[in-house]
A protein has these predicted regions:
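Aromatic-lined carbohydrate-recognition surfaces of secreted/lumenal glycan-active proteins
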Residues: 2-49, 100-118
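Short, flexible/disordered intra-domain loops and linkers
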Residues: 31-44, 72-85, 119-124, 155
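Aromatic- and acid-rich polysaccharide-binding/catalytic face
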Residues: 39, 45-81, 141, 145-151
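Glycoside hydrolase catalytic-domain groove-lining segments
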Residues: 58-59, 65-118
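Alpha-helical scaffolding within the catalytic cores
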Residues: 40-54, 84-98, 127-132
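Extracellular/periplasmic catalytic domains that process cell-envelope and extracellular macromolecules
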Residues: 13, 55-58, 101-104, 137-138
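Substrate-binding cleft of secreted/luminal carbohydrate-active enzymes
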Residues: 60-61, 67-70, 105-174
């Protein structure tokens, strides 16, 4: 499709560019990912990802899956327990697609956001944000921080303090 045409056209003009697509070729999924491998729903999710991965992964130099979180603890208290599972399973599935259809050297940089992604602009509880940062940086090659549009910069914002602490720890511990 059009992804392939765009990729090939860009590469003809600029072979040095590393091209990736927001979310694709992985269909972000919370409900099926938390079922874990082997479940019928999980296998259906993998099948959808296979269909898209077979087309797109060969034409992807860097992967940008999205692991935004949609469920406030106040209205979905049980779902918070699955945050690390959701991130882990989505990144594991992205790695499977890359391994099966793409290039092993292509990095994975998930999009993350410190707000609950349900249209409310409410920050994630700090413990959940720390979990998101830890799991993402432990299992991916980095991350893309999303958000902050038309917001004044706050050096002491809890989300930023968490990022700085994690990056400092990474450098100190190698």
């Amino acid at each position: 499709g059009k992804y392939v045409t765009i990729y090939q056209g860009l590469k003809q003009r600029r072979p040095d560019l590393r091209i990736g697509w927001y979310t694709d070729p992985l269909r972000r999924d919370y409900w099926r990912a938390k079922k874990l491998p082997g479940a019928t729903e999980y296998k259906a999710w993998q099948s959808e990802n296979n269909d898209l991965g077979a087309i797109m992964a060969p034409f992807t130099d860097v992967y940008f899956p999205s692991v935004y979180w949609f469920y406030p603890r106040t209205t979905h208290p049980m779902e918070a327990d699955y945050l690390s599972t959701y991130i882990h399973e989505n990144l594991s599935e992205m790695k499977r697609i890359r391994r099966t259809y793409g290039r092993a050297e292509a990095p994975i940089y998930p999009y993350v956001w410190w707000n609950i992604a349900n249209g409310s602009d409410v920050p994630m509880p700090l413990d959940m944000w720390e979990t998101m940062v830890r799991v993402t940086l432990d299992e991916a090659d980095g991350m893309v921080l999303w958000g902050g549009y038309q917001q004044p910069w706050d050096e002491n914002a809890p989300w930023w303090v968490t990022i700085k602490a994690r990056l400092t720890d990474k450098r100190r511990t190698g």
